Each structure stands twice: as structure tokens, then as C-alpha cells.
């Protein structure tokens, strides 16, 4: 199932790129996500998602499949198992960033595959959940980006 989300952040594309490719920095912005381990370009963690009446918690791994700085395009592969053994989830997430005046337009395309209880919900419900999560993520991300102590661009 393909989900598409579009949003804008009020920082230049270079800053948006530096931020969105810093998984450790942006993970806390994602509702229900928790980063537990970083091993080079591999990230382990868990995410809790409410879909309809079901709350699913997945434990898994994500890694960059593509990081093209000149095109400001990044592809992340993620997969996880429901911690209660009630299914799996896998996603290929592509983020494309383009300059938009003094800000950046970001288009996120997610190719999502889920099994288990969550899979009973159709594309409409999943798209609504995705839209809500991305909305909360963007709000949190904007606040972080606009903090004067923002570390974007630093390596550490």
C-alpha cells in the first residue's frame, strides 16, 4: 500500500537535508517512536501505533538504502515485528526535498506492507493514521528546527 504525505518546513533545503538524515536527532519527533541502538548506518528501535481500536507495538530495524545529497533524496528501509507476535510491518520510505522560497517542500512516499491484526484496516484508515502521525511529526520537527540551540550540521 502506498501512502503519500507532503509538507513544508521553514528552513532552507540544506538544513532540512542535514536534519532529516540525522536519525538520532529526528527520532524523538516521530510520535510513538523510540531509538534504542545505532550501529553505523543501521538503526534499531520500536514504534507504537494506534490503528482504529488496536494499538500495535513494533520492534525493528531501519537503514538508509539511498542517500543522494545532490538531489536531496533519501530512501529508508524499515521492518519490524509486533512485540506481541501479532504480525509484521515493513516500509520503504522515500523523502524528496525541494527548495520552496525560503523553506523546503518535502514529499514522503511510503510503500507499506503490514500483516496481522493491523492489516484488517483498509487503505483509508492507514492513510488517516499516516496523515495524523506525519502532522504531529512536522509540528515537533518545526519546533526543533526553530530552536536557537539547534545542532543541525554538527557531527557528534
Across the structure, where does each feature detected by a protein language model lie?
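Hydrophobic ligand-binding cavity/cleft-lining segments
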Residues: 1-42, 46, 50-54, 156
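Short acidic, gly/pro-rich beta-turn/loop elements at beta-sheet edges
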Residues: 15-17, 54-59, 72-74, 86-88, ...
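Hydrophobic pocket/interface hotspot
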Residues: 16-20, 26, 64, 108, ...
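A conserved amphipathic terminal alpha-helix motif
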Residues: 117-153
Amino acid at each position: 500500500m502506498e501512502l503519500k504525505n507532503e509538507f513544508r518546513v521553514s528552513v532552507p533545503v540544506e538544513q532540512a537535508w542535514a536534519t532529516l538524515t540525522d536519525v538520532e536527532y529526528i527520532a524523538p519527533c516521530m510520535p510513538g517512536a523510540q531509538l534504542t541502538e545505532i550501529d553505523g548506518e543501521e538503526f534499531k528501535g520500536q514504534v507504537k501505533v494506534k490503528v482504529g481500536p488496536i494499538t500495535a507495538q513494533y520492534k525493528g530495524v531501519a537503514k538508509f538504502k539511498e542517500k543522494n545529497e545532490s538531489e536531496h533524496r533519501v530512501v529508508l528501509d524499515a521492518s519490524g515485528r509486533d512485540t506481541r507476535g501479532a504480525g509484521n510491518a515493513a516500509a520503504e520510505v522515500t523523502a524528496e526535498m525541494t527548495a520552496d522560497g525560503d523553506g523546503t517542500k518535502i514529499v514522503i512516499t511510503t510503500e507499506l506492507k503490514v500483516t496481522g491484526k493491523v492489516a484488517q484496516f483498509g487503505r483509508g484508515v492507514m492513510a488517516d493514521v499516516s496523515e495524523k502521525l506525519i502532522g504531529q511529526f512536522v509540528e515537533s520537527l518545526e519546533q526543533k528546527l526553530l530552536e536557537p540551540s539547534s545542532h543541525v550540521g554538527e557531527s557528534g
